[in-house]
């Protein structure tokens, strides 16, 4: 259930409900409703939650991790850290992306 996963992620980070509410700009009671299943966050809030907690939105919603085809991503230069705009080499971008994906899968 979404609320249970949300609470587990929050407590594993050592965050209180109040701290999460502060991060999101809502009341503690409003945040608490997410954890007990009385309310569901909108897409913008869900994205914020996933970023704060370091998990995917798929994990929060369904308990599953997004599936990545690592070889496809690593072999497509256009998808490799496009925001770097030539500041790093393609090989460095591949290494960075591999590290980030590996870290994400190890944490979950």
From Swiss-Prot:
Residues 6-60 form the HTH cro/C1-type domain. InterPro entries: Cro/C1-type_HTH, Lambda_DNA-bd_dom_sf. Signal peptide: none annotated. The keyword Phosphoprotein does not apply. Keywords: DNA-binding, Transcription, Transcription regulation. GO terms for molecular function: DNA binding. The keyword Metal-binding does not apply. PROSITE patterns: HTH_CROC1. Residues 17-36 bind DNA. It comes from the Bacteria. This is SPbeta prophage-derived uncharacterized HTH-type transcriptional regulator YonR. It comes from Bacillus subtilis (strain 168). The gene is yonR.
């Amino acid at each position: 259930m979404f609320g249970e996963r949300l609470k587990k992620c929050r407590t594993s980070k050592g965050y209180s409900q109040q701290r999460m509410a502060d991060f999101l700009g809502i009341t503690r009671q409003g945040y608490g409703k997410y954890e007990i299943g009385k309310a569901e966050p909108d897409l913008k809030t869900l994205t914020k939650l996933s970023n704060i907690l370091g998990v995917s939105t798929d994990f929060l919603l369904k308990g599953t991790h997004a599936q990545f085809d690592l070889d496809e991503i690593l072999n497509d230069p256009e998808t490799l850290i496009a925001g770097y705009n030539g500041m790093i080499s393609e090989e460095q971008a591949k290494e960075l992306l591999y590290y980030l994906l590996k870290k994400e899968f190890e944490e979950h």
